[in-house]
């Protein structure tokens, strides 16, 4: 009899041993020297009955802090946003419930159309001409943009702003190390990229210039100035953007960006230990054949009816492994679907209104924090995040706020030693006036 949870019974094991011509597990592993073989029993507890198992995991889950119970002012790349209820309903349908693009695309027209709509909406937001079907997350997309730029320009120097998310820079450096590429960081000045330092670093060996807009500190970057420096030579201009912010801001494509990447988490993807997310990657037609990942295109069949296909597949590793544009094979199709459903449900006007509320509520939070004696650092145009400076140790502030029902902002001292005692505060459209007022009052006690 097969067990509900165990993949292999005693009879199954014996059948497999007979099939390969050995009598026992001991005989199967006989070539492994006795002195390096594990002896004894594994330290694994006895099996639990289903009600006991559910109770055990429920107890573990109860130790987590849930956003339904706390008001979150934590962002730094993962944000608490409104998710339309229809999103979970659609992505739970069996036809869609996979992280992969279909291997027989001609019989998966619904899934391909959903991905095509995702690509189309990303192009609209970014002001670009081509977008792929998604990537693992924003940092992966950023690293792939840098790799593509180096391949396109035949250069090996990558200039990246220190105002780009630290974890995205870590992923970039990991990718660059294996390919012997040079990553040079551009300093910041008052919370934005230092254009003068960029000018000093830029030379004929530069493959790309990478900035984030809005950047990690929440500030809006001077994209026009950075673009003019980036395109002095053959380098590409790469912009990492929060797609929700692009519902309100002038798109990077309008500033001459060659590649726009980011994380679609603000659209329909919940906060969950930092993932899974959904990276997006958009670029120009000129660079279309160098784009990593899958591309869904629209065409017509032999009867003149509209259809969708995976196109330009000669770029991919299953066609030409040695000359592939990247080693990205799977993607985040399910989360891309969630993002597409969220964007379509909220609509153009809704996305703009949602972005506007982020700006307005962040501005209101700033004013309330100031009124409670809190110092705002690196002030200037921002989207939904800003920096505050506190006199008390931030771990004490975080614990005190949690006890009052708030999840504090991000401790910048963890990744920027010079910003010890500085907190990155995020305010999204789901925060209420009452929550912001009370948060400002509680934080003011540590000013």
Swiss-Prot record:
Name of the top EC class for this enzyme: oxidoreductase
Disulfide bond sites: none
EC number: 1.4.4.2
InterPro entries in UniProt: GcvPA (IPR023010), GDC-P_N (IPR049315), GDC_P (IPR020581), PyrdxlP-dep_Trfase (IPR015424), PyrdxlP-dep_Trfase_major (IPR015421), PyrdxlP-dep_Trfase_small (IPR015422)
Listed Pfam families: GDC-P (PF02347)
One GO BP: glycine decarboxylation via glycine cleavage system
Keyword Oxidoreductase included in the entry's annotation: yes
Catalysis: reaction(s): N(6)-[(R)-lipoyl]-L-lysyl-[glycine-cleavage complex H protein] + glycine + H(+) = N(6)-[(R)-S(8)-aminomethyldihydrolipoyl]-L-lysyl-[glycine-cleavage complex H protein] + CO2
Sorted UniProt keywords: Oxidoreductase
GO MF term (any one): glycine dehydrogenase (decarboxylating) activity
Protein origin, superkingdom: Bacteria
Family: Belongs to the GcvP family. N-terminal subunit subfamily.
NCBIfam families to which the protein is assigned, alphabetical: PRK00451.1
Function of the molecule: The glycine cleavage system catalyzes the degradation of glycine. The P protein binds the alpha-amino group of glycine through its pyridoxal phosphate cofactor; CO(2) is released and the remaining methylamine moiety is then transferred to the lipoamide cofactor of the H protein.
Quaternary context: The glycine cleavage system is composed of four proteins: P, T, L and H. In this organism, the P 'protein' is a heterodimer of two subunits.
Protein name, UniProt field: Probable glycine dehydrogenase (decarboxylating) subunit 1
Organism of origin: Halalkalibacterium halodurans (strain ATCC BAA-125 / DSM 18197 / FERM 7344 / JCM 9153 / C-125)
Source organism phylogeny: Bacteria, Bacillati, Bacillota, Bacilli, Bacillales
Protein's gene: gcvPA
């Amino acid at each position: 009899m097969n067990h509900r949870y165990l993949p292999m019974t005693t009879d199954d094991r014996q059948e497999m041993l007979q099939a390969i011509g050995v009598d026992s597990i001991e005989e199967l592993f006989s070539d492994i020297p006795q002195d390096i073989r594990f002896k004894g029993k594994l330290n694994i507890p006895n099996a639990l009955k289903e009600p006991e198992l559910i109770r055990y995991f429920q107890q573990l889950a109860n130790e987590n802090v849930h956003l339904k119970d706390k008001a979150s002012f934590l962002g730094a790349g993962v944000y608490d946003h409104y998710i339309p209820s229809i999103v979970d309903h659609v992505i739970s349908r069996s036809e869609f419930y996979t992280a992969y693009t279909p291997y027989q695309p001609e019989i998966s027209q619904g899934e391909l159309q959903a991905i095509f709509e995702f690509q189309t909406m990303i192009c609209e937001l970014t002001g670009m001409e081509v977008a792929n079907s998604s990537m693992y997350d924003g940092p992966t997309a950023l690293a792939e943009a840098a790799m593509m730029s180096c391949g396109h320009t035949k250069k090996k120097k990558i200039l990246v702003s220190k105002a780009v998310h630290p974890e995205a820079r870590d992923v970039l450096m990991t990718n660059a190390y294996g390919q012997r590429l040079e990553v040079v960081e551009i300093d910041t000045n008052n919370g934005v990229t230092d254009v003068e330092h960029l000018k000093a670093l830029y030379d004929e060996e530069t493959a790309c210039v990478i900035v984030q807009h809005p950047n990690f500190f929440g500030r809006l970057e001077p994209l026009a100035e950075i673009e003019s420096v980036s395109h002095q030579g053959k380098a590409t201009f790469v912009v990492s953007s929060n797609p929700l912010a692009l519902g309100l801001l002038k798109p990077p494509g309008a500033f001459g960006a060659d590649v726009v990447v980011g994380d679609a988490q603000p659209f329909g993807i919940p906060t969950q230990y930092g993932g899974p997310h959904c990276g997006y990657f958009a670029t120009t037609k000129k660079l279309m054949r160098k784009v990593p990942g899958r591309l869904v295109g629209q065409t017509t069949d032999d009867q003149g009816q509209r259809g969708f296909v995976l196109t330009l597949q000669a770029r991919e590793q299953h066609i030409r492994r040695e000359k592939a544009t990247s080693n990205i094979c799977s993607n985040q199709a399910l989360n891309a679907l969630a993002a597409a459903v969220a964007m379509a449900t909220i609509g153009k006007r809704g996305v703009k209104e949602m972005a506007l509320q982020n700006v307005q509520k962040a501005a209101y939070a700033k004013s309330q924090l100031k009124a409670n004696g809190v110092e705002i650092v690196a002030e200037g145009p921002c989207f939904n995040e800003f920096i505050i400076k506190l006199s008390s140790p931030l771990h004490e502030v975080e614990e005190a706020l949690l006890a009052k029902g708030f999840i504090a902002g991000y401790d910048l001292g963890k990744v920027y030693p010079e910003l010890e005692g500085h907190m990155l505060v995020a305010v999204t459209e789901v925060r209420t006036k009452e929550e912001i007022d009370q948060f400002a009052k509680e934080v003011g006690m540590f000013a």
